[in-house]
């Protein structure tokens, strides 16, 4: 992947279950991102553990893995210049209550863990996360 052009995103289980996928995808596209690849996935608990390996020592790790394996997610590769930075700005802070008004997490997130969407935090993470899901 070319740096600064691609990022990885994942619509989380509660947003998929609450039928917010279409609204979130529209918002992503209307902010200049092109959806290059998209796949609906049901992660096993073990897959969630692998995806969040870097958070293994955190106190919320087990709960996060249970949650992320509780339903389908939408994994996708997005394209735009400065993709990682711009997408992080679009989705907002991890905690929806602290996210800027107008961001995806502020609009659709329920809590710090059930915050509707994941976005890579670096070009390296984006590449690793895309590879993890064979995207």
Specify the residue positions occupied by each region the protein language model found.
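Non-catalytic terminal and connector segments of soluble metabolic enzymes
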Residues: 1-135
């Amino acid at each position: 992947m070319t740096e600064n052009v691609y990022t990885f995103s994942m619509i989380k289980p509660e947003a998929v279950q609450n039928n917010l996928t279409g609204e979130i995808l529209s918002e992503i596209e209307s902010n200049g991102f092109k959806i290059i690849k998209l796949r609906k996935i049901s992660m096993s608990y073990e897959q969630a553990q692998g995806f969040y390996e870097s958070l293994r020592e955190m106190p919320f790790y087990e709960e996060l893995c249970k949650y992320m394996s509780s339903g389908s997610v939408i994994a996708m590769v997005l394209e735009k210049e400065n993709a990682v930075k711009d997408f992080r700005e679009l989705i907002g802070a991890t905690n929806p209550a602290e996210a800027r008004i107008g961001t995806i997490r502020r609009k659709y997130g329920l809590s710090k863990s059930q915050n509707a969407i994941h976005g890579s935090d670096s070009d390296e993470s984006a590449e690793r996360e895309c590879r993890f899901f064979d995207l």
